[in-house]
Curated annotation (Swiss-Prot):
GO terms for cellular component: acetolactate synthase complex. It catalyses: 3D-3,5/4-trihydroxycyclohexane-1,2-dione + H2O = 5-deoxy-D-glucuronate + H(+). The gene is iolD. InterPro entries: DHS-like_NAD/FAD-binding_dom, Myo_inos_IolD, THcHDO_hydrolase_firmi, THDP-binding, Thiamin_PyroP_enz_cen_dom, Thiamin_PyroP_enz_TPP-bd_dom, TPP-bd_CS, TPP_enz. Mg(2+) binds at D493, N520. Keywords: Hydrolase, Magnesium, Metal-binding, NAD, Thiamine pyrophosphate. It is an enzyme of class 3 (hydrolase). Thiamine diphosphate binds at E65. Pathway: Polyol metabolism; myo-inositol degradation into acetyl-CoA; acetyl-CoA from myo-inositol: step 3/7. The keyword Kinase does not apply. Residues 442-522 are annotated as: Thiamine pyrophosphate binding. Its cofactor is Mg(2+); thiamine diphosphate. Pfam families: TPP_enzyme_C, TPP_enzyme_M, TPP_enzyme_N. This is 3D-(3,5/4)-trihydroxycyclohexane-1,2-dione hydrolase. The lineage of its organism: Bacteria, Bacillati, Bacillota, Bacilli, Bacillales.
Length: 644
């Protein structure tokens, strides 16, 4: 048997260079590159291996471990899970910073390979710098926290363990039904230890992502269910995009006259203008999709996890005869809502159903309902685009909260811009193939409802975990995946302040991204949530501490985000009017470096809910009558929802 004497880290790098995926007959490298932040826990081990021979891996320098791991996830998401980035960090806090990203990737079923440095396997220098000591179990390190949020976790305590660990890692990373974060912990001493690895460990490995076919029995059951139903509705989930099944979904909708709503992950699989595309569905959905969904007698979920936002906490579907048909590659997700399960690739399942349903000449019984619902939403959308603030008699979209306070915000922020009008103008002015990236705050709701996707795969929303601070790093990841397209991070001031470190990496790599920063000086959507459930405004506005009350109810904070970003070398713009916004968007397109447009918008001018409810933990007992009323409303709504 031929062997190669290498360190554990060198063997890992060589192995990663030999991984390929094949999908629909097309083969490509699986691991595009690796994000690094070096510390004592990885620099002389994995860092040495990368310096000596990185092979074809592109090595990137991150600025924050969570930021670079978010970028890696966004890269894989934009690549439809067919190519990934790895991430290496040092031991302790560097590793811990990636835990949030691991959770984000696993929640979204997006493959990311995390390689956190770890404490010494020998324990000789214990406690090493940045080591946690647990007196009840000395084998525990910070990296054990990854177990809860990883789809596969392993620790390499001996060099020869690398082989089985990485074979299993690739199994999970290339499995569409169970992919997510894979964490391989690398003790810093083991990274540098040598072993005689067999040559066959480094052979070219092609991981074929196969399309699972539906069984004849499940297909027959699905046909029987559909033919009994008159008003079905489909839900286009992220699985439609990852399975590249958009054309088949279009064909299914057009052939059988069945409309579909979009989840955040599924949006832009098909253009918004398609006659059967109702748009966003659920808590952050629009009036068209939610109105049709309420009356549907069959819900066909395609590649969706049926989160509470999609089902409106399982209260959206009000037809007493409604049933569920779930098409999903994952048996776990297909099993939800007591559904009839078709465990299969979305494309193959749709093609099989098309053949079977054409045999019986199936048609839904919709007449004008689909067109009427879309027309009603277009009318509402036009209204939202044209909302303008007036100092007197202005009623914000989220009314009853700040009606008397808005003039204070006008003065403090120097703006009269409404969020819906800003989104409308951005949607009009961006290139049709531009990619928008979002994750947290009020913007995901506005974008799922309002954004018109004019080209496929241009809407990139991380809403499986709604990770605050994902947006800027996510934009970098999307840009690395599609460097020829303009990429825009749609981010609020709250999320931007949590994390935007990879803006600097975008400059370093000459990968231009555009940050559209909506500043309403607060955590606006959570302010809406608390006040909408009977509370006052508490801890969600960005106000100075009042020296008299000792509370955060002083003057409104105004931050010059443009000036801050300019210090990095970003081209920046200040915007307080639609005219300035148009000039900034046109100017940003001409730039070759990353840009940031600091857009001051008024709170409470985002969209509100349409025909939906969200179950949150309202206080059962309170001295506040409005909280009591909110609890009673919760109980009433819960009675109309499924129990599971």
């Amino acid at each position: 048997m031929q062997t190669v004497r290498m360190t554990t880290a060198q063997a890992l790098v060589k192995f990663l260079n030999q991984q390929y995926v094949e999908f629909d007959g097309k083969q490509q490298k699986f691991v595009k590159g690796i994000f690094t932040i070096f510390g004592h826990g990885n620099v002389v081990g994995l860092g040495q291996a990368l310096e000596e021979d990185a092979g074809e891996l592109e090595v990137y320098q991150g600025r924050n471990e969570q930021g670079m791991a978010n970028a890696a996830m966004a890269f894989a998401k934009q690549k439809h899970r067919k190519q990934i980035m790895a991430c290496t960090s040092s031991v302790g806090p560097g590793s811990a910073n990636m835990i949030t990203s691991a959770a984000t990737a696993s929640a979204n079923n997006i493959p990311v390979l995390l390689l956190p440095g770890d404490v010494f396997a020998t324990r000789q220098p214990d406690p090493v710098l940045q080591q946690i000591e647990q007196t009840h179990d000395l084998s525990i390190s910070t990296n054990d926290a990854f177990r809860a949020v990883s789809k596969y976790w392993d620790r390499i305590n001996r060099p020869e363990q690398l082989m089985t660990a990485m074979i299993q890692a690739m199994r999970v990373l290339t499995n569409p039904a169970d992919t997510g974060a894979v964490t391989i912990c690398l003790p810093q001493d083991v990274q540098g230890e040598a072993w005689d690895f067999p040559s066959y460990f480094f052979q070219k490995r092609v991981h074929r992502i196969e399309r699972r076919l539906p069984t004849k029995a499940s297909l027959a059951d699905a046909v029987e269910m559909i033919k009994r139903k008159k008003k079905p509705v489909m839900i286009c989930g992220g699985g439609v995009r990852y399975a590249e099944a958009a054309e088949e979904l279009k064909q299914f909708a057009e052939t059988f006259h069945i409309p579909f709503g979009e989840t955040q992950a599924g949006k832009s699989a098909i253009e918004s203008s398609h006659p059967y595309n109702l748009g966003g569905i659920g808590v952050t959905g629009n009036v068209a999709a939610n109105t049709i969904a309420k009356e549907a007698d069959l819900v066909i979920g395609i590649g969706t996890r049926f989160t509470d936002f999609t089902t409106a906490s399982k209260q959206l579907f009000q037809n007493e005869e409604v049933e569920f048909l779930n098409i999903n590659i994952s048996e776990f997700h297909a099993n939800k809502l007591d559904a009839l399960k078709v465990i299969a690739d979305a494309k193959e399942a749709l093609l099989a159903l098309i053949d079977e349903l054409q045999e019986i000449d199936y048609q839904s019984s919709y007449t004008v309902e689909i067109a009427d619902a879309k027309d009603a939403w277009e009318t509402e959308l036009s209204r939202l685009h044209n909302i303008r603030f007036t100092c007197q008699d202005f009623t914000p979209e989220v009314e009853g909260h700040f009606n008397e306070n808005l003039n204070e915000y006008v003065d403090a922020l120097g703006t009269q811009l409404t969020q819906t009008a800003v989104i409308g103008q951005i949607n009009t002015l961006l290139d049709k193939d531009a990619i928008i990236v979002g994750a947290a705050g009020s913007l995901p709701g506005d974008l799922q409802r309002m954004w018109a996707s004019r080209k496929p795969n241009t809407y990139h929303m991380e809403y499986g975990y709604s990770c605050m601070g994902y947006e800027v790093a996510g934009a970098l990841g999307a840009k690395l995946a599609e460097p020829s397209k303009e990429v825009y991070a749609m981010v609020g001031d709250g999320s931007y302040q949590m994390l935007h470190s990879e803006l600097v990496t975008s400059l370093q790599e000459n990968k231009k991204i555009n940050v559209l920063l909506f500043d309403n000086s607060g955590f606006g959507c959570i302010n809406n949530l608390q006040m909408g459930n009977g509370m006052g405004s508490f801890g969600t506005e960005f106000r100075y501490r009042n020296q008299e009350t000792r509370k955060l109810d002083g003057a409104i904070m105004k931050i010059d985000f443009a000036a801050s970003a300019a210090g990095y070398g970003v081209k920046t713009y200040h915007v307080t009017s639609l005219e300035q916004l148009q000039e900034a968007l046109i100017g940003a397109k001409k730039q070759t470096v990353s840009t940031l447009i600091d857009i001051k918008v008024l709170p409470k001018t985002m969209t509100n809910g349409y025909e939906s409810w969200w179950h949150v933990g309202v206080a059962e007992v309170s001295k506040n009558q409005s909280v009591q009323a909110a609890y009673e409303s919760k109980v009433s709504n819960l009675q109309q929802a499924r129990s599971y």
